[in-house]
Amino acid sequence: MSRALMIQGTGSNVGKSMLAAGLCRIARNRGLSVAPFKPQNMSNNAAVTADGGEIGRAQALQAMACGLEPHTDMNPVLLKPETETGSQVVVQGKRFTTVRARDYAKLKPQLMQAVLDSFKRLKAAHDLVIVEGAGSPAEVNLRNGDIANMGFAQASGTPVVLCGDIDRGGVIAQIVGTQAVMSAEDVALVRGFMINKFRGDPSLFDDGYKLIEQHTGWQGFGVIPWFADAGNLPAEDALDITTRTRDTGLHIVCLRLSRIANFDDMDPLAQEPGVRLTMLNAGEAIPGDADMVIIPGSKSTRGDLAYLRAQGWDLDLRAHLRRGGHVLGICGGYQMLGGSVADPEGVEGPAGTDEGLGLLDVETVMTGDKRLTRVAAIHAPSGTAFNGYEIHIGRTSGPDAARPFAVVNGQPEGAISGDGRVSGSYLHGMFRDDAFRAAWLAQFGVAQSVSYDATVQATLDALAAHLEGVMDIDALLDVRL
């Protein structure tokens, strides 16, 4: 009989996504047909699915841990922030609407039905579904109409295990306090807890572990030491991508935009021993020794173009090019490189046109139709075949597009400047392709030496072994109401 287990956390960034991925790999290793599920995710880091939709990147990684292709049912509601108070709402892989935060609650009854429909399909197709919550069930002010945590657990009859993060301190209060503010009906669904991100000797927490068991009456499933190889997995949050402080190597600088999207494009480059990656924060100047500057994707191209200028990066980019450096724009970054970005219909925000950086002779017009597709492409300069995906609104054209970055289905894609030092492309995921990454790095005299997908698979296996060694996995996988 098919079962489900939900991992909820005492807060954001306690490690729910990684733990869910590890449990998915463990279940698969034990011969179970297992699938991941997250009712509601908030992220601008999306993956394109085989069925032509988009889901959170964390669920795509969890699908990989299960040996499955990502599917839109694995993350039926995806919120993609566009402003401080508004998000695009993606339902079962397709853009549904854009809504202000205070109006989102009105949509929840309709969204809950979509969530339950997707969950039922997954559960019917698999032995086990590992469900990941969002944020924390302790945010009881949001409990009414909740579809992400206890609201979903109640509606679906799914047992819950609570995860606390000891690295940030106060884990006893995290778990005991969460129970204290929850309703009796919700507490009844919780079957236990686990402690994540422990550094040092776990036996030093034995007394604290027992205190949590005594105060809550919940079963403890284990204390999980810090997993040192977590950085080898695709980043879920832009802040998870850190500067790799190698002393030598090709120095690549990525601008950390305010609405940065699909930032896991940087992960494969960060793994390369011959690359020194700097994630540039607000207020920091582009270093004088940078070889390549990457302007990544953005959920708000015109907004981030203004943000880029506010940091002085537009002037830095011109100085970087005068020093002989190179620039690559990906998706929204590509749009920024042109002469203008026009949004006559107000698709991304207020209607209007903004001047671009003028580093490529192209122009972009935003359109209401969104392109979501996986592609097989050929890198025009090297002739290398590779795989990637498109996830964007807007169309870009102009004289520099006559020198394409790639060829997709026989059609030119992207643009390269006359001197060859500024490039732009809509294609995400290209650096994940080992053949493309090797060809691209070879332009700068760097040898590619990492098989990225193999590294991720090996890290998922190591994560599974890490959890198996410290948790009562048999009891955890047997949890039921």
Swiss-Prot record:
UniProt protein name: Cobyric acid synthase
Any one of the GO BP annotations: cobalamin biosynthetic process
Function per UniProt: Catalyzes amidations at positions B, D, E, and G on adenosylcobyrinic A,C-diamide. NH(2) groups are provided by glutamine, and one molecule of ATP is hydrogenolyzed for each amidation.
Positions annotated as active site in the UniProt record: 331, 428
Record Gene3D superfamilies: 3.40.50.880, P-loop containing nucleotide triphosphate hydrolases
Annotated GO MF terms: ABC-type vitamin B12 transporter activity; catalytic activity
Involved pathway(s): Cofactor biosynthesis; adenosylcobalamin biosynthesis
Keyword terms of this UniProt record: Cobalamin biosynthesis, Glutamine amidotransferase
UniProt superkingdom: Bacteria
Membrane found in the keyword field: no
Gene this protein is translated from: cobQ
HAMAP family associated with the record: CobQ
Organism (species): Jannaschia sp. (strain CCS1)
UniProt record similarity statement: Belongs to the CobB/CobQ family. CobQ subfamily.
Keyword Transport appears in the UniProt entry: no
Annotated ranges, domain GATase cobBQ-type: 249-436
